[in-house]
Amino acid sequence: MKVLWAVLAFAFLTGCRADVEPQLEPEVREPPKWQAGQPWELALGRFWDYLRWVQTLSDQVQEELLSSQVTQELTVLMEETMKEVKAYKAELEEQLGPMKEETQARLSKELQAAQARLGADMEDVRTRLAQYRSEVHTMLGQSTEELRARLSSHLRKMRKRLLRDAEDLQKRLAVYRAGVQEGAERGVSAIRERLGPLMEQGRLRANTVSALAVQPLQERAQAWGERLRGRLQEVGSQARDRLDEVREQVEEVRAKVEEQATQMRLQAEAFQARLQSWFEPLVKDVQRQWAELVEKVQAAVGTSAAPVSSENH
């Protein structure tokens, strides 16, 4: 009996523990990589890859999210995508033959709806990132882990929605193109002649779009180079100004030294003249007295020499 009660108690406790354990969040599978072929698909692929990079929420991403850099980049990519979609639709309507107006109106309406959904979802991504930036600025240095978690979850869901929108738009474009081709009563040779330029235009547009993708990086590098060149010119100008200032100071010092040297030379000449005026009379007086003394000695010697000579004779 005790064993039975023990088994029942264990089962009861196990069931309670199972009830209070939190339900794990289901693992979200990464959507497959977007397959691109047409120019609008390539443009959407760049938007997709950029959004994948933003979703990593790396240090660089978080730093650029605090500014308007990310939203500006997304705006450019979004505008390029919608522009390419409109251009591709216009090319289909221009290059391929007519169809029934009723069918064309229906397909065009469905295509516009799919295009609008894609644009709205891309706009939602940009709005959500702008909202995240505003919320981070409001936190004033507090922890933003919860905000980043919500943003990551939202971006993951938005990427799924964008993938569904893109696939739906891709299918409707294919249907639209097929409907146009079915309505056009042309031979295989005529289709080949018409589609050849269209495919060439698509290839050229794809190359142009790929070049435009590199253009922002080139513009950034050129802007950085211009800023560096401007800074170097500014430093060089400051150095030249400082050198000119030092040169002027040296010239001023040299002029002052020359002026002082001239004054000292003039003072020395004046002092020399003054000394000469002082000692010249004294020198002349000494010379005169010396000459008189010599004359007296010579006279005395001559007088004493004369009697001695006479005595010898």
UniProtKB/Swiss-Prot annotation:
One of its GO terms (cellular component) is chylomicron. Heparin binds at M158, R159, K160, R161, G225, E226, R227, L228, R229, G230, R231, L232. Residues 274-286 are annotated as: Specificity for association with VLDL. The modification Phosphoserine is found at S143. The modification Methionine sulfoxide is found at M139. Residues 154-164 are annotated as: LDL and other lipoprotein receptors binding. Residues 76-251 are annotated as: 8 X 22 AA approximate tandem repeats. Sequence repeats lie at residues 76-97, 98-119, 120-141, 142-163, 164-185, 186-207, 208-229, 230-251. APOE exists as multiple glycosylated and sialylated glycoforms within cells and in plasma. The extent of glycosylation and sialylation are tissue and context specific. It is found in: Secreted; Secreted, Extracellular space; Secreted, Extracellular space, Extracellular matrix; Extracellular vesicle. Keywords: Chylomicron, Endosome, Extracellular matrix, Glycoprotein, HDL, Heparin-binding, Lipid transport, Lipid-binding, Oxidation, Phosphoprotein, Repeat, Secreted, Signal, Transport, VLDL. SUPFAM superfamilies: Apolipoprotein A-I. Residues 262-313 are annotated as: Homooligomerization. Residues 206-286 are annotated as: Lipid-binding and lipoprotein association. GO terms for molecular function: amyloid-beta binding; cholesterol transfer activity; heparan sulfate proteoglycan binding; heparin binding; identical protein binding; low-density lipoprotein particle receptor binding; phosphatidylcholine-sterol O-acyltransferase activator activity; phospholipid binding. Residues 1-18 form the signal peptide. GO terms for biological process: acylglycerol homeostasis; cholesterol efflux; cholesterol metabolic process; chylomicron remnant clearance; high-density lipoprotein particle assembly; intermediate-density lipoprotein particle clearance; lipoprotein biosynthetic process; melanosome organization. It holds the Pfam family Apolipoprotein. APOE is an apolipoprotein, a protein associating with lipid particles, that mainly functions in lipoprotein-mediated lipid transport between organs via the plasma and interstitial fluids. APOE is a core component of plasma lipoproteins and is involved in their production, conversion and clearance. Apolipoproteins are amphipathic molecules that interact both with lipids of the lipoprotein particle core and the aqueous environment of the plasma. Homotetramer. May interact with ABCA1; functionally associated with ABCA1 in the biogenesis of HDLs. May interact with APP/A4 amyloid-beta peptide; the interaction is extremely stable in vitro but its physiological significance is unclear. May interact with MAPT. May interact with MAP2. In the cerebrospinal fluid, interacts with secreted SORL1. Interacts with PMEL; this allows the loading of PMEL luminal fragment on ILVs to induce fibril nucleation. Belongs to the apolipoprotein A1/A4/E family. This is Apolipoprotein E. The lineage of its organism: Eukaryota, Metazoa, Chordata, Craniata, Vertebrata.
